[in-house]
Amino acid sequence: MLQTSKGSNSSSTSSSRSASISTATPNTIVEDEELLCDPKSELTPPAVANPLRPVSKSNTSVEDDSKPSFTYDLDVFNLCKEYLNTRNHHGLALIARQKGIPPILRFKVWPILLKSHPFVISPFIQPDSELLNESTSSRSNSSSSSTGSNTPLSTAPGSIKDAAIIDGDANDNDNDSNSNSNDDDNDRDDNDANTKEKEEDERNNKIREKIKRDLAKYIQRLKYSQSKYTVSETEHEILSILENAIMKFTLKWGKIIKYDSSLTWIALNLAEWFPPIPKTPWVLVGKEYSSSHQSLIVNFLDDYSNYIDNIPDLREYLERLIYHDEKISTISFREVYERLVLVLLHCPQPVSRRKKSDNQGSNQRRNQSEVQKDQQSFKVNKTTLPKTGGTIEERVSYFIYCLRKLIPELSQYFHEEQILTKFGCLDDEWLIWWLKFCGTKVWSKYDRGRIWDFMLGWRLKNPKRDFNYYYEKLNYVNRNTLEKLGPDIFWSVGNEEEDISGDNNVDANANEINNTEKTETGKLVKREGDIKRSSFKDLVNELSNELHISKRVSTDEVATSTSSPATTKMASSSSTSSTLTPNVSIPFSRVDPHVALIFISLSLLKSKENILVELDQHEIRQFLSRLPSKSYKYNQKRSTRQKRTSYASNASSTSNSPMGQSPVDRDEDSIFPTSRIVISNDSKDQKHKVNFIDNIISEAGELWRKWLWSEMVEDN
């Protein structure tokens, strides 16, 4: 543990400020005998520059080679700015799940998305089994102690004395003895209260020490080459804010989940995108960042300076958001952190637990038979899990099942290497970090940020709302811009027939009628005289019918309805003589976000398959526990080959493809910086870079449809 000051007291007034990574003053050399590499070394790190100094464009310590590759459609970016300025959570959620939030806007968008997220409005976290056992045993002990005593005692003042007065045989001596007894009871109650308070303080102090130790591990990861290191004033303040946020969450939700290092890692990963100190641009650097002075913090605008400089007035807009915003979002780090944990750790309430709470009087034999029946009907669970989600145990089982089905070669190799045969702190904990904690700690911050965008933007369609309601909520977004967002990533078969269902609004009743007609005519479900219906076809129909809502809209109406001048000009220039255009579709989420995360994880494994089959058991676990990112540029030695690939891709790509499109030359960008559809963060020497994590998410949708189709075939 990091050393603490000997003179520090445990008073409540000083604990809030001293609750930091170390009680040593800022810029003091801190040494950790357990965590640091060489405690006896006298190596002193170079002095850390004042982090509050504005970063100069020409004097930045971040080289171009360390900047993440990032491309983003300009029309979608402007639409995101419009929704952000108006706090339109409907539009921001749509962009987040379809294309991701621009990283430079996440610090303002994420709080808005979290405030309206369904898992924050109706939270449920799977309780820890140990805490459930403790609460059950405590209740049983309290009930046994109360029933075992023949004379129930009341702790209310004067209760025993009042009982003596009611008794006609009471005398003065009895009253004196009763008063003494009452005083003894009060003293005993005070002692019990003090004992409980001390025990609670000891528990909280232990939790706080664990938080400090986990924060120290993060520092040691970044400053591994130094046995002694300095913590600047700003770094000290950030770590203190993180510690207090984690501690307050643990105190609030401690009866449901106990403290785990994952809570600290969620806070650390959030602080890589959301500045903990209000009105500052300083975030944690993350494990990929390479800095000459090895500072813990960085200005989050530095990574995307190339992108920012390609858009006029964007830097001034971002600086206003950082330093002067009082309207869009002023939520604190602690509140954002609590809501983020509720989303990442959310799970649906188990059916067995709901039945148990509803029918507490049912006998134990019936409950056991229901549990055995649920365990035997895994086929039914496969048809409900994609929509409802499940516990972490169910998701792990589902992941292994899908891995064997979709990536059999890698699954066989994992079986041979015994990768998925045992779980524990030192075994296959990587899978728990992937699925339960949503990539916390083990994924790259750039990949994790995009996936968290997807999860925070997850929204279901309200079947009681029609197209006009949502189209109005989106501020009548331009059709061309809406088309760039594309369909839901996890769309399923049968959407084509739904797209041309008619000119009227598609509501829930119309969907149900269309589904019935299609089922009876055999267009979607071919019964072929068989009375037995396909459960997976039912799942497909249910997902397809509520996947999106659409409406045929005239070109003139769409072109004039948008509030963005740039998108209006584009729509008017592309209008044709026809009065009607194809359907305007608004995609909605249908697959549970944690189930979608399973297919994203499978897609990540598939992309690393060639590497994994060359590694042994230990190397695989280590690799998957610190999954490298492809968001950074290739090495300079590959730049020549990459240029040739970029030019070839540029010749074959179309101007309407935002994904994988090669940017144009730098000189043209400097003359007409806003004429491009896609703005890139790449430097001049390395122009083309595939958006790795976007391709991973798209491939996850393909794996989802492949799994669904294979299950439908087997179900027949």
Curated annotation (Swiss-Prot):
Keywords on record: Cytoplasm
Compartments, as annotated in UniProt: Cytoplasm
Membrane spanning stretches: none
GO cellular component term of the entry, any: cytoplasm
InterPro entries reported for this sequence: Rab-GAP-TBC_dom, Rab-GAP_TBC_sf
Compositionally biased residues, Basic and acidic residues: 191-205
Domain named Rab-GAP TBC: residues: 100-459
Cited PROSITE patterns: TBC_RABGAP
Low complexity bias (residue ranges): 1-25, 132-168, 503-514, 559-581, 645-657
Primary localisation category: cytoplasm
Compositionally biased intervals (Basic residues): 635-644
Chain intervals for the UniProt region annotation (Disordered): 1-66, 132-205, 352-376, 502-521, 554-582, 634-669
Family the UniProt entry places it in: Belongs to the OCA5 family.
Name by which UniProt lists this protein: Oxidant-induced cell-cycle arrest protein 5
Organism: Candida albicans (strain SC5314 / ATCC MYA-2876)
